[in-house]
Amino acid sequence: MFAFYFLTACISLKGVFGVSPSYNGLGLTPQMGWDNWNTFACDVSEQLLLDTADRISDLGLKDMGYKYIILDDCWSSGRDSDGFLVADEQKFPNGMGHVADHLHNNSFLFGMYSSAGEYTCAGYPGSLGREEEDAQFFANNRVDYLKYDNCYNKGQFGTPEISYHRYKAMSDALNKTGRPIFYSLCNWGQDLTFYWGSGIANSWRMSGDVTAEFTRPDSRCPCDGDEYDCKYAGFHCSIMNILNKAAPMGQNAGVGGWNDLDNLEVGVGNLTDDEEKAHFSMWAMVKSPLIIGANVNNLKASSYSIYSQASVIAINQDSNGIPATRVWRYYVSDTDEYGQGEIQMWSGPLDNGDQVVALLNGGSVSRPMNTTLEEIFFDSNLGSKKLTSTWDIYDLWANRVDNSTASAILGRNKTATGILYNATEQSYKDGLSKNDTRLFGQKIGSLSPNAILNTTVPAHGIAFYRLRPSS
């Protein structure tokens, strides 16, 4: 039995034009980097951060855009007599300024963590009521990014206004320091953050914490479906759970302020290769931050080749900043072991007049899927040039780095990294304008008016395309 959903949304001006003034000039594209929490949790140290940064650089990932090295919870040992935070000397013997300087000297950016509560989620000192002292601590230690959590908030939530003012206090304090600091809210979407986040922050989490499961329900993540206004966000939320919650929120994100679907689980847990590809593709397409959650010293070749797929990253870093829209959604009868099964089609405009299209199979069997120009350009009027033109179809995964080459790179063969796109030398925007083939995938055909785009999509997998006006 099928159930059908078709999206007809009132799009904000931000969604139409892809323009949102960044409140602090940062976050013009979604942030990319690495965060320790998903793999290491509280097992953090100076050595972990610096070794990870060196490895990310050696793997060519820094020059693909993964430049933020984000230290999560558990770094503090308390406060000094003046009320300033103190780093744990056992974990960070040279202090946070040393970490920042090492990262900056190697062209990385340094991120740290606190919580808009009395304590952090792991029970360390929080920043509620201490915003100015703590913002100055971060600025003094040359921090470039703050992840700001939501634990132990003393009940200061329940309406958008209450949460807004609690998070605005740190926003104001960061700005007062005079240091540009990317401000990443982690309040789990509580109190409709997507409505007010862009006025005070550069990104905002929109759900409970992700887990390395594609569809598995979990009682600790009680809301599902399209419950974007979840009263108890929880954690251990599956990839499809978070994606469906994010579906209506794209109209409230754009340049300078992004919906954050949480860190990437590629290379974490036991996701299949098709699930990892779908996960990475959809996070890229909806313009979520691309934050590696894996241990980069222990990546398998297939996961590395996903993180380094320039044609997919280029979708995420597209300068117009418009998240893709879910155009349709069907439930299907071939459910998986958890009773989950659905298929979806997503579409979104790109800066150079191209269009990104995804056919997502959340069912348990491989299946034929299709779409048309009328669905792809669902907002266009009949007779629109988009509907009467022929479009070339590029498979965004067709030129993926093979496992042999990925293994060579992981084995520290620096020559092998020469095939990778280098966004430090040439931005994604410039590479697209110069038709760098690494950013387009492989042309597999064309789609003419009244024709149908047909493909076969594996279970828990994706077909991911860039459409370009036919040459």
From Swiss-Prot:
- In this chain, substrate is annotated as bound at D72, D73, K147, R205, Q251
* Entry annotated with the keyword Transferase: no
Q: Does the keyword Glycoprotein apply?
A: yes
Q: What are the protein's UniProt keywords?
A: Disulfide bond, Glycoprotein, Glycosidase, Hydrolase, Secreted, Signal
Q: Outline the inducing conditions.
A: Induced by galactose and melibiose and repressed by glucose.
Set out the biological process GO terms recorded for this chain's protein.
Answer: melibiose catabolic process
Q: Which residues are glycosylated?
A: N105, N175, N270, N370, N403, N413, N422, N435, N454
Catalytic residues, per the record, are: D149 (nucleophile), D209 (proton donor)
Tell me which CDD domains the record gives: GH27
Give GO terms: molecular function aspect only: alpha-galactosidase activity
Per the UniProt record, one Pfam family is Melibiase_2
PROSITE patterns named in the record:
ALPHA_GALACTOSIDASE
Summary of subunit composition and partner proteins: Homotetramer.
Q: What is the protein name stated in its UniProt record?
A: Alpha-galactosidase 1
UniProt source species: Saccharomyces cerevisiae
Gene for this chain:
MEL1
